[in-house]
Amino acid sequence: MRLRWGQHMLLLVVEFTIEPFVEGQPGPHVTQAVAAVEQHGVKVDFGPFGSMFTATEASMPTIVADMMRAAYSHGATFVSVSVARQSAS
């Protein structure tokens, strides 16, 4: 994406959880969903109760759709997604 002088790229923070929860090690419904996000060149901060990544406003819908397709096609029963603007630092 090419920005003109003075334009700012809006970044969004996407937090997500994928069920069922598997004790000990995440199942393929989680690992494949994370892999789907990372195929877009985005790093996922993986946590035990939820994970997150940052994406541009333009790329977020495609990344989330790919993540959800991967999760459900590998056995997810519920996916929760929350999206917020990244706070200015």
Where are these regions (language model features)?
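Charge-rich, low-complexity N-terminal segments
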Residues: R2-S89
